[in-house]
């Protein structure tokens, strides 16, 4: 479709793969217009923020996402998705769908192996949010979920192995390679 957008970003994470300190934030406004080739006229706002703080071998993670559609009708390509590690970990990737999506998370990670070649971590997250047709339902009908995971920093990037859980379904197992922070992993599509 045809759209205009403006995007502002702030990235001070010390490591895109397994950050130990810093913050990442992104704000984006998108205006899709039929006159530019879009299927419908609609506007969307996306905001995300993640931060890390480390004390010795202990790391605290916090973050949130708020993506909203300002119009009632949107084409299927404008729908937001949630699910997957650190994006409503108790749900399969992209299994939560809606014109609006939001979540908050808090996490803890402990460095169990301090080898410079293959550092290893064990961590957990607690997450709350949802995808919904109406903006007001994102958090009022939110779902509690989280994860327990192992992470290893390899020369090819991090490997995450874990289990996600949610209040309304059984466990979701995951194996993930690569970045979970930064612009490539925080987008809506």
Q: In which residue ranges do the predicted regions lie?
A:
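C-terminal outer-membrane beta-barrel translocator/porin domains of Gram-negative envelope proteins
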Residues: 1-120, 124, 132, 175-182, ...
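Acidic/histidine-rich, metal-coordinating catalytic segments
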Residues: 127
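C-terminal beta-signal and terminal closure region of outer-membrane beta-barrel proteins
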Residues: 135-189
């Amino acid at each position: 479709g045809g759209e205009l957008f403006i995007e502002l970003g702030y990235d001070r994470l010390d490591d895109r793969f397994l950050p130990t300190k810093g913050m990442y934030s992104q704000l984006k406004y998108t205006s899709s217009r039929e006159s530019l080739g879009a299927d419908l006229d609609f506007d969307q706002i996306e905001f995300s923020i993640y931060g890390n703080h480390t004390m010795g071998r202990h790391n605290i993670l916090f973050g949130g996402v708020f993506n909203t559609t300002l119009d009632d009708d949107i084409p299927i390509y404008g729908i937001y998705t949630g699910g997957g590690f650190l994006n409503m970990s108790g749900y399969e990737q992209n299994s939560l769908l809606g014109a609006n999506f939001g979540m908050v998370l808090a996490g803890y990670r402990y460095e169990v192996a301090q080898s410079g070649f293959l550092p290893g971590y064990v961590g957990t997250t607690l997450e709350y949010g949802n995808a919904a047709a109406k903006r007001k339902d994102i958090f009022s009908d939110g779902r509690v979920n989280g994860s327990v995971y192992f992470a290893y920093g390899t020369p090819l990037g991090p490997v995450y192995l874990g289990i996600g859980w949610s209040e309304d379904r059984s466990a979701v197992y995951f194996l993930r390679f690569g970045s979970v922070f930064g612009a490539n992993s925080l987008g809506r599509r």
